[in-house]
Amino acid sequence: MLRSISIASRAAGPVRPVARARTAVGVVAPPRVCCCAPAVGNYGQVDGKATLNSLRRLPAGYRPRSCPSSRSPDVKKVLVVGSGGLSIGQAGEFDYSGSQAIKALRESNIETILINPNIATIQTSHHLASEIYFLPVTADYVAYVLEKERPDGILLTFGGQSALNVGIQLEKMGVLERLGVQVLGTPIRTLEISEDRDLFVQALNEIDIPAAQSTAVSTIQDALDAAKTIGYPIILRSAFSLGGLGSFPHDEEELRNLAAKSLSLSPQVLIEKSLKGWKEVEYEVVRDAADNTIICCNMENFDPLGTHTGDSIVVAPSQTLTDEYHMLRSAAIKIVRHVGVVGECNVQYALDPNSRDYRVIEMNARLSRSSALASKATGYPLAYTAAKIALGHTLRELPNAVTKSTTACFEPSLDYIVTKIPKWDLAKFQHVERNVGSAMKSVGEVMAIGRTFEESLQKAIRQVDPNFAGFEAYWKPEDMITALTNNNDRRLFAIAHAMLNLDYSVDYLHDLTKIDKWFLYKLENIVAVHKQLRSTPFEQLDKELVMTAKKTGFSDLQIAQLTGKTEAEVRTLRKQFGVTPFVKRIDTLAAEFPAYTNYLYTSYNATTHDVKFDNGTMVLGSGVYRIGSSVEFDWCAVTCSRAIRDLGKKTIMINYNPETVSTDFDEADRLYFEELGFERVMDIYDLEGASGVVVSVGGQLPQNIALRLKKAGVQVLGTDPEMIDSAEDRHKFSSILDSIGVDQPAWTEASSLASAKEFANRVGYPVLIRPSYVLSGAAMNVVWDEAQLEHNLTLATNVSPDHPVVISQFIDNAQEIDVDAVAHKGKLLVHAVSEHVENAGVHSGDATLVLPPFSVNQHDLGRLKTIAEKVAQAFQISGPFNMQIIRKPPTGEEDAELKVIECNLRASRSFPFVSKVLGHNFIDTASAAIMDTNVPAPIDLMAQKRDYVAIKVPQFSWTRLPGADPFLGVEMASTGEVASFGKDIYDAYWAALLSVNGMKLPKANSGILLGGDITRPEMTEVAKNLINLGFSLYTYDPKVEAHINDQPYLSIKKILVPVKDKKKLREILEEHEIQTVINMARSRAATTLDEDYAARRAAVDFGIPLINNPKLAVLFTETLEKKFVKNNPIPYSEGFKPSEVGSWRDFVGEAATTKLEGIAWTGEAYCIILIPGIGV
């Protein structure tokens, strides 16, 4: 725990320790015009304004200028730049930070404009910002919005690396100065210094802060030369990039390939001396324009340096630091003051475990992933406070929004320990490298709170995956030494195996892993209790041992597995002993001052409750972000919680994801930062005496325990869990569809391999393997022959051994349609029909969705509505549901075939998309249906004509997953989504495509690499479109070469694609100026020696756009044809506005159907009004 803290204020004199959670004394009033500390040099007073008067070792390009005023009374309109689609390295934490920033602006009566194409986020809901632009977060498009809206200020530090890079570009373009837009908070020059590694090291040298020996380079040869000078081992780090794009090359050839890859994605890389094995420590710092500075939180990585902090287990506060804590704290304050941060930032250190020697790794002068973790770990509203500081407020005048009883100038103090564990989904990808290093690979993270490290860690392990009971030996590698020495996504379980089964000592494990012995001794405590439980018969368990186990973080299921009993039997015994958890409050002050927060957790290391209980309605959140469940389910959970509160009912949110808005302090009457498993939900339900539980807005995780909750006597609100179970079980679901006359593909229950083969031969290949109770298509596969059938059927049954596996006919070349809907007691209230661009066979989460649908006629829309009505009635649905339907186009006068392939009796990932596109909040309607209160009348949104189109495009993170095959199939692979509006499908797709992080359009006369299945009818059409646009076509496949060259007026050249030599492959792509890869392969590569695989992988490795679906390739080329001028995209120019540049209100406007509280700007203050026709 932290023993003492202080508030640093230059005005108050030298830094001195004070009692924790107390403000500094002697803080004097700021000067008439307050200023931030300079990036370099000292400020002096001239005519009441602070100016730079000492130029000592200025970084190149720095221009002395007056310091900005601490207050901005003229700022009445501010543009907030969002982060775009979720990707590895830049995820949902920016929805949280951006949402808090917008709330802070609203409180200050400032009109807020938001640009963010991530339609799944809370911040893009229209009760927050007054205008929202679903446009690319690029300098050009932000400039278009600035031209149109003419704001007074811009906030760049709440949209991650994307927003920061855009701000720097806008400054260089001169747009901000020309339009008179003030950068609020941290100035651009400070952002540049923090991002340019060379300038940052220069700044650190000026104040005698040590940094790792490094050289900034922008070419491959310079990287090789720098490495020779510094000497291996080295680390290669990218500047201006998110999520630590870097790695540890061991020799010249590895460095050459890594530098080429990094320089294709970032303009500069840093070659540093490797400090692998040192401790890694972070400090979150807040500073205002009057130079008041506090440390919000310090965190320590469980894993030593060498693993990206986003992929590390992290604890807060630090546990193994002594005097080093104050040394690094003072250095962080010194750095932040020197470079001139105004707002929030984090400083990362490498600390020698055997001395007080340290190095600064980096500084993020913006809200970051660590900021979100620190904010949730301490209860301190970092993003809210940073936004207020950006408007000129000081820490000492800002109230703490959480405690209501202190100011923001109080440093948080913790009487608990927080553990963060990353969530990797590497097992979903074929050929992926599972090692974990300096390049981030995790897709999400969990945060657990306990009173001991053991309790906190075991909680966090269960939060990562419900299949994990705790610190157990889930991985038993054959080569233990390699598994422990080289970090990977399963090393924690290898350590458990080493300690539980192989009796490795703490000293030996420390030598292998370099993990601090303090942490290893804590793991040894868990192992000791584990062994005691394993050796004690259930009948001999006493209260003392059960209490010890619970205090050490063991779950009921874990104890049951060790004693040979069921979870229910352990729960019954535990309650008989009176061993139940206590509810504790996070007050940010370690209980030193009265503070009545609603931010709660449970612990067995306590003796009293901190709260009284009041029968609220529980809403189960989505848990950790992972592929298949991301920010869209947080939007659903938050929206539902707000709707229930609007009905006058108290809400209880349960979630453990620090990146979410649902875990914000003001989104529910009570927030439990807790597990979403059966045991903990039941504990909270019993303690609170809750009036009911909502399980249908948090994705698959809450659904999986719905039936158990009902059987335990819980009042599950909305659709009956028995019906949920029937829809989740493919066999039961198909039987119900048969009974109501809704068509579906032919199917059978695969009870044996022989019966599966017989079915496949009867209906014909391809067939689809579908296990029950899975999310994002885990283990689903299209099977094209008998050999694949054997392999995939085995894989599927391993995923869900307790549920039957369904094998169904796969309809090739069919269209897929999503139907999102809400019903009440079996009656359909509202529905939306979205059309996939890709044919069936691509997971709906990876598909490109179009709304309103572009090729479904009114007759088929009516038939789809009828199917939705039948399904709602059959399952007696009360709440949200989603269906995926196959549409086989007719061959003659008959109707198109419509076959239901899946139905989820919960909100889907497309609910935010359809709600915002149609202007009707589906979750508000669903919440009314769930609560059976104020249920609206049915409405047919699809019968209304609209003069706009919206397209949702997936965001992939292939670059972060070395070796993974970038192929689209029935198993989901995307990490996020973006969406844009347009007057037609081409405008919308153009904007959505450019919204994808890292998307670079091909230039005129460049090369396109074409490959894949020549039987695809789209291949010839795509080739014709590209040649008409002036592109040169290349292929590596002789079949493609022959096929294209046989067509009139088309030509393609065959080139070599080396499948083993990355260096040679890169040179060939550069030689032929390949700027896009289009691959139409029918199936995933069997090996890494496949040329299609090599081409796809090369595209993502070297930052080349990849189009890997035939239908998508047609839309891509048609869009280029519509949007290119002289075979090139139109660059930004003053006074020009592309047709897709419009706000949500510009496009949706009066098409919105739900009356909802909106925000209007009167010129003096925000007014909360009812806007006719405005929803979402």
Curated annotation (Swiss-Prot):
EC number: 6.3.4.16, 6.3.5.5
Region annotated Carbamoyl phosphate synthetic domain, chain positions: 611-997
Binding positions (Mg(2+) 1): 348, 362
ATP-grasp domain residues: 201-391, 734-931
Residue positions binding Mn(2+) 4: 902, 904
Chain positions recorded as Mn(2+) 1 binding sites: 348, 362
Positions contributing to ATP 1 binding: 197, 237, 243-244, 273, 275, 280, 306-308, 348, 362
Carboxyphosphate synthetic domain, as annotated region: 70-465
An MF annotation (GO) of this entry: ATP binding
Note on domains (UniProt): The large subunit is composed of 2 ATP-grasp domains that are involved in binding the 2 ATP molecules needed for carbamoyl phosphate synthesis. The N-terminal ATP-grasp domain (referred to as the carboxyphosphate synthetic component) catalyzes the ATP-dependent phosphorylation of hydrogencarbonate to carboxyphosphate and the subsequent nucleophilic attack by ammonia to form a carbamate intermediate.
Name of the protein in its database record: Carbamoyl phosphate synthase arginine-specific large chain
Species per Swiss-Prot/TrEMBL record: Cutaneotrichosporon cutaneum (Yeast)
Phylogenetic lineage: Eukaryota, Fungi, Dikarya, Basidiomycota, Agaricomycotina
Gene expressing this chain: argA
